Amino acid sequence: MEFYKSKYTVNESPVYVSDNMTGKMAGVPAISTSVLCNTFCAARRASGDTVCAHCFAVSTMKRYTKANEHAEKNAALLMNRILAKELLPIFGNVRFVRIEAFGDVCNVTQAVNYAHIAKVNPGVIFGWWSKNIRIIARAFDQIGGKPENIILIESSEKVNVEKEPSSPYVDKVFTVYDKKFIKENAVEINCGARSCVSCQRCYTKGTEAKVHEILK
């Protein structure tokens, strides 16, 4: 078992933390698995009417093979067993962490591991994006509820179609719209910042429950 230490963590852990995110995610540490080994993601990409058909993570993981290697190792580690507390990453001077920047949760074991990571880092906000809310809800039920420092964001599966939260655990819904639909329906885009660090809308409770982004 390999151990890693991120510039954002105070300990070594077999869970790899991405600490060199770019674009709007610059400065945000992330714990991710790979879209390339996710059967849920593959099935949704095959359906042309989903936002997954436009997935940026596929090209990113294919281009950055080392990053994909770490993400696939995270998948194997997090999906197959509940990790002992001493194996979980402990974050230092960090305000928030992204869960799943390049994939999605696949099973309850993985979701429980993410919840445990949040529990051992009570001073950090974890923004968790997912389309597989049922899996996460089962994990939260199993551990006695959602940790208070997790903001669960349900991603709408289709472009231009905002879904309703599928669980009481969901804090926000994230929907992507194309420019034509935005213009014709006067959709307010409130995720347009060039920096998640400066915006923080998705990592702050009490802000808008519906987050809208332009399709890239």
Regions found by a protein language model. Name each.
Residues 1-216:
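Class I S-adenosyl-L-methionine
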